[in-house]
């Protein structure tokens, strides 16, 4: 009887360890954070992470073996996406636990914020209030495919790499909220600084669309 119980327990923990293996690599966590934003091809993930196609495919296979991602063949490309919404919750839970339990994570956040002069960080609560005002413009800095997948209501899409060339088209009589992929992305702060340096009243919302949706009704 004891042996049956032990085998049962060991089999379950062995299965769960596959999830642990998926999360044991910083690059696999980065891939998951990217896929939270929307489905992507292997080539797109490779470009975003700076890894070779071969390394990207290897990491994706491990994530697929752990059932954290699924894939679909579309023409000449293989497209990957998060397996289900629980995985999205898991990614953000991991980020939140890291921020709370690891002093290094908070130090990195603080040092980066301190290094970015002329930024106006805002909380989600402040952003919700500002979004209700007609004089506020929300800019989503993510690539177009991620914006098309999901975005904050009434936000416009100006990918970070195109922001500087579009500055002349932005209204200076409105407050501007910029957001990107969340707390592990530097673009919101950098975009806020760029806009403020050019005479705008810009605010950095260092939160993701997921954070916006999850917290807006609380």
Which positions does each model-derived feature cover?
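Short, hydrophobic-biased segments on the C-terminal half of alpha helices
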Residues: 60-61
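Catalytic cysteine-centered active loop of the rhodanese-like fold, especially the PTP/DSP P-loop
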Residues: 68, 170-212
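Alpha-helical residues within the helix-turn-helix
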Residues: 47, 64-65
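Beta-hairpin "wing" of winged helix-turn-helix
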Residues: 65-74, 81
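Flexible, polar/low-complexity N-terminal or interdomain linker segments that lie immediately upstream
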Residues: 42, 81-137, 141-149
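N-terminal leader segment of winged-helix/HTH proteins
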Residues: 1-23
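Positively charged, proline/Ser/Thr-rich regional signature most characteristic
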Residues: 126-184, 190
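N-terminal helix-turn-helix DNA-binding core of bacterial DNA-binding proteins
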Residues: 15-54, 78-83
């Amino acid at each position: 009887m004891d042996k049956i119980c032990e085998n049962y327990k060991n089999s379950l923990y062995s299965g769960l360890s596959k999830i642990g293996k998926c999360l044991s690599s910083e690059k696999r966590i980065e891939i998951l954070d990217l896929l939270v934003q929307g489905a992507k091809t292997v080539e797109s993930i490779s470009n975003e992470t700076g890894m070779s196609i071969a390394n990207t495919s290897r990491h994706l296979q491990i994530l697929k073996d752990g059932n954290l991602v699924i894939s679909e063949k579309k023409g000449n490309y293989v497209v990957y996406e998060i397996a289900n919404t629980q995985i999205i919750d898991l990614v953000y839970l991991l980020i939140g636990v890291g921020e709370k339990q690891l002093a290094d994570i908070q130090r990195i956040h603080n040092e980066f914020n301190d290094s970015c002069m002329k930024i106006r960080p805002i909380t989600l609560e402040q952003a919700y209030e500002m979004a209700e005002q007609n004089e506020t413009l929300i800019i989503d800095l993510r690539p177009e495919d991620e914006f098309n997948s999901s975005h904050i209501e009434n936000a416009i899409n100006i990918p970070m790499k195109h922001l500087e060339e579009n500055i002349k088209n932005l209204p200076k009589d409105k407050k501007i909220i910029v957001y990107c992929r969340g707390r592990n992305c530097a673009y919101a702060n950098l975009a806020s600084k760029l806009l403020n340096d050019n005479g705008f009243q810009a605010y950095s919302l260092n939160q993701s669309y997921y954070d916006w949706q999850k917290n807006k009704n609380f």
